[in-house]
Design a protein with these regions (language model features):
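A cross-kingdom feature marking charged/low-complexity
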Residues: 608-636
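Alpha-helical scaffold repeats of the Armadillo/HEAT/TPR superfamily
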Residues: 158-172, 562-563, 602-616, 646-655, ...
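Proline-directed, serine/threonine-rich intrinsically disordered cytosolic regions
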Residues: 28-31, 718, 722-778
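Alpha-solenoid helical repeat scaffolds
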Residues: 1-66, 70, 74-86, 92-105, 134, 404, 542, 580-584, ...
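Intrinsically disordered, low-complexity domain-flanking/linker segments in eukaryotic proteins
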Residues: 159, 425-443, 667-693
Length: 778
């Protein structure tokens, strides 16, 4: 049928049309199968789609008839494979089981002859570019159908292992391998041909059929089309990438997959040709009512953006397509040098931006748009009920975008980690090395290529602007994000100068400058924590998480004049409503203690008092114990006086809790609950036995006593004996046989097991001498 018959096909029910294609291919005789497939591949009426007109606001997507058609044809072929195999097996019952394999081979041969006939006709040169996509659609369906049938037969075989009746052999694996090779050949030709013709289109040397395809999904406002044969081919490749081994994909040029795949993924979210400006206008249509609740209409710009993203034919394939692009990045990363690989992921083709810069721009625009909207930081109960469906849809799109970005950048980071030199060698800083942003001096460098370090910094900047989404999964995000995040920081941590540069650049983005003097007040450069906006608070949390991992390599001046002034307000303004900012600041300080930074000596009085005041509102019992152990372990190597001062502060807090005489009902309730639960977790806010109700906090006196016992393995020999005396008194202060006493004795024994060689012998003697008294009545 000619192209003019396209409108007639549009009048047919889609299920009837593609169902009929699958039915006839499964039932026709072999010569007719060949003819039918040939017509299917070269049909102008089937593959010429109507013109699509996007709306004027730049956010409404054009229809995607080409992608829809290729996917539907693939599904029809998969159905035909299933039905043909069922027919072959039915005939084998009468003709013998060994005819089934021959019949299936002959049918697949007929399909392949029909697929190939268009490429070998007299007008092959004119037809070749046009038939490659239909050929790929047919092969994709056959591959999916055979793979699905193999899995189904394997499942049935496992279920009928003890059954005497054997299944009719079909040797599907040999047919799958044959189709895989043909599928890869056509995919490589399709992407290569479309790349060449796209270049001709941009250069003005386009023929009639090229212009026709360009118009299919294009628009009149200068946007690149999204419903092109190249993009449709990528959609088919994404559907079948898991069915083809990676080593078979070598004929496909990985740079084409990356160069074409990234813009396609961006187009799902309304980014065409690298133009991200439309993202800046999102979320601004959220409104606040008189009661302070936010609302977002379904027909608003943001609502339509979410709806159109989810209705995009590639939205459901964004995960497989991102993995396809990521695998291509990995393959290129293993063979390219540092400069070539960096160019691959930072410079796009045809003047467009590459993978990392494009994702960075998208993330930055979304970050600013979201953080300035009425939805930022607002829990569900502060959103109008009528808007819940729309905001839920928006969040689904946001999280899909985050997973897509994580998949792509994980491949970049993985390649850098794999190609980094091992072992890492460190060199003194050059005398003429330029200072970093903020005037921080250069630090020792390493033999890791600078382009790799810059690439990792760019990746971290992308996730800085996406942390408002990541943080919904918890302070550390989700598993694949954690792998990417900590792998990046691990490599940067091997280069002290890169650590300083990374923190300096992030600080510059936050608008935080160097504090001119160590004694200056933090408020001169940092907004008070209570007045921080959602954007500031989110960025500070991410900044502190990065600085925590790099703290050991940062110069003392940067720690004292930048990090502490940034995190201290979030420690002082400890609001349970902003737990993330407190926990990230708290973790950074512990990292400074672990690294033995000089500033921790003067910080100790403030920080220890803060810890003792933070239970149970901000810290659990386990967190409090871990923090005190970290502080004492760090101080015991540098200052005996501060170490013992910290121990005395814990003892004073215990004495104050005793003197304060906590309400009897609370104390007795804690004891009765402990007696009723022999496990006695002691962690504030943990899950109860039923998994629903939290376990009430332990009395402060008992939590501090457990922490004191844990300090036994953290002090040096100078204070060891004195601390044992205090722990002994705390044990005897509890009634014999009480659950509280059992917990303190158990924690003491655990701490003694961690003693080093200097204190182990004396600690064991002390335990053997007093353990009968400790456990009396147990």
């Amino acid at each position: 049928s000619p192209a003019s018959s396209t409108d007639h096909l549009e009048l047919m029910d889609r299920n009837n049309l593609y169902g009929a294609i699958g039915y006839y291919l499964s039932a026709l005789s072999l010569p007719n199968v060949t003819d039918f497939v040939h017509v299917l591949v070269v049909s102008a009426s089937l593959w010429t789609a109507p013109r699509a007109h996007p709306s004027d606001d730049g956010l409404t997507y054009a229809a995607h008839p080409l992608m829809t058609r290729t996917t539907s044809v693939a599904q029809a072929l998969a159905f035909a494979v299933s039905e043909r195999i069922a027919l072959i097996l039915k005939n084998a019952e009468a003709r013998g089981p060994y005819t089934a394999q021959r019949d299936l081979r002959d049918w697949i041969d007929a399909l392949l002859v029909g697929i190939d006939r268009g490429s070998r006709s007299s007008d092959a040169d004119a037809l070749l570019p046009r038939v490659l996509l239909p050929q790929l659609a047919v092969l994709t369906g056959v591959l999916q159908g055979l793979s699905s049938e193999r899995q189904e037969r394997a499942r049935k075989h496992a279920a009928q292992r003890d059954d005497a009746k054997e299944m009719v052999p079909l040797h599907l694996q040999s047919h799958i391998q044959r189709i895989q090779l043909e599928w890869v050949r056509v995919l490589a030709a399709m992407l290569h041909t479309w790349d060449e013709h796209s270049a001709q289109l941009r250069g003005g040397a386009a023929g009639r059929w090229e212009r026709q395809y360009w118009r299919l999904g294009g628009s009149d406002d200068g946007h690149a089309p999204t419903d092109t044969p190249g993009n449709a081919a990528l959609a088919l490749a994404a559907q079948s990438a898991d069915l083809v081994p990676g080593e078979l994909l070598r004929p496909v040029r990985d740079e084409l997959i990356v160069g074409m795949g990234v813009p396609v993924l961006a187009s799902i979210y309304g980014v065409y040709g690298g133009d991200t400006r439309a993202l800046s206008r999102l979320f601004a249509d959220a409104q606040l009512d008189a009661s302070g609740k936010a609302s977002l209409a379904a027909d608003s710009r943001t609502g339509r953006w979410a709806q159109q993203a989810q209705s995009h034919p590639l939205y459901a394939l964004s995960g497989p397509l991102a993995r396809l692009v990521a695998d291509a990045v990995r393959r290129k990363g293993l063979v390219l040098g540092a400069l070539s690989f960096t160019e691959l992921v930072t410079r796009g083709s045809s003047g467009q931006r590459g993978l990392v810069p494009l994702l960075a721009d998208m993330a930055q625009r979304l970050d600013r748009a979201w953080s300035s909207s009425a939805l930022a930081g607002r829990p569900t109960e502060e959103i109008e009920g009528s808007s819940h469906a729309t905001t839920r849809q928006v969040w689904q799109v946001n999280k899909t975008l985050l997973f897509t970005v994580t998949t792509l950048l994980d491949a970049v980071v993985e390649c850098v980690v794999e190609r980094c030199p091992s072992p890492t060698t460190t060199y003194p800083p050059a005398r003429d090395a330029p200072a970093h942003e903020g005037g921080w001096p250069s630090q020792p460098t390493s033999n890791i290529p600078d382009v790799y370090l810059a690439l990792l910094r760019d990746v971290l900047h992308v996730f800085l602007h996406l942390y408002w989404i990541t943080s919904t999964f918890g302070l550390d995000g989700f598993e694949s994000y954690r792998k990417l995040f900590y792998s990046s920081l691990d490599v940067l941590g091997r280069d002290p100068d890169a650590c300083t540069g990374t923190v300096a650049q992030l600080a510059q983005q936050l608008g935080v400058d160097r504090i001119p003097d160590a004694s200056a007040e933090a408020s001169t450069s940092v907004h008070a924590a209570r007045d921080a906006s959602f954007l500031e608070r989110t960025h500070v949390v991410y900044f502190l998480l990065v600085a925590e991992q790099l703290a050991a390599e940062l110069p003392d001046a940067m720690v004292e004049r930048l990090l502490l002034p940034v995190c201290r307000p979030y420690l002082e303004y400890a609001d349970p409503a902003f737990q993330d900012s407190f926990e990230s600041a708290h973790s950074l300080v512990l990292a400074l203690y672990t690294a033995g930074k000089n500033c921790t000596l003067s910080l100790t009085p403030f920080y220890v008092n803060l810890l003792l005041q933070s239970y149970p509102q901000l810290l659990t019992a386990t967190q409090l114990e871990t923090a005190l152990c970290t502080v004492v372990a760090s101080l015991s190597e540098r200052s005996d006086s501060l170490t013992w001062w910290t121990v005395e502060q814990v003892q004073d807090a215990i004495n104050a809790a005793v003197l304060a005489r906590l309400p009897a009902s609370s104390e007795e309730a804690g004891s009765s609950r402990a007696e009723g639960d022999a496990s006695g977790s002691g962690v504030a806010g943990g899950d109860g036995p039923g998994g629903d109700a939290p376990v009430p906090s332990m009395p402060l006196r008992e939590v501090l006593a457990l922490s004191m016992a844990a300090l036994i393995s953290r002090v040096n020999l100078v204070h060891f004996r004195s601390l044992l005396v205090k722990v002994k008194a705390l044990i005897f202060a509890q009634p014999e046989g009480s659950p509280a006493r059992e917990r303190i004795v158990s924690r003491t024994f655990e701490a003694l097991a961690d003693l080093n060689a200097a204190t182990r012998e004396e600690g064991m003697k002390w335990w053997l001498e007093h353990s009968p008294e400790f456990t009396r009545g147990a």
